[in-house]
Swiss-Prot record:
Biological process annotations from GO: cytoplasmic translation
Protein known as: Small ribosomal subunit protein uS14
GO CC terms in record: cytosolic small ribosomal subunit
Co-factor binding comment: Binds 1 zinc ion per subunit.
InterPro entries with a match to the protein in the record: Ribosomal_uS14 (IPR001209), Ribosomal_uS14_arc (IPR023676), Ribosomal_uS14_CS (IPR018271), RIbosomal_uS14_euk_arc (IPR039744), Ribosomal_uS14_sf (IPR043140)
GO molecular function, one term: rRNA binding
Family named by the database record: Belongs to the universal ribosomal protein uS14 family. Zinc-binding uS14 subfamily.
Keywords: Metal-binding, Ribonucleoprotein, Ribosomal protein, RNA-binding, rRNA-binding, Zinc
Amino acid sequence: MTKEPFKTKYGQGSKVCKRCGRKGPGIIRKYGLDLCRQCFRELAPKLGFKKYD
């Protein structure tokens, strides 16, 4: 019998991007987005976020 991998219940390893599945410290969870920063940069204009100088 093989053991199942340990699932993290809390911390950075438990947060995953809804779009690509990345884990780690670059997850944006504000407003329930749950996107990594790379996916957020691609989707931000479609979501209505504007970039100000």
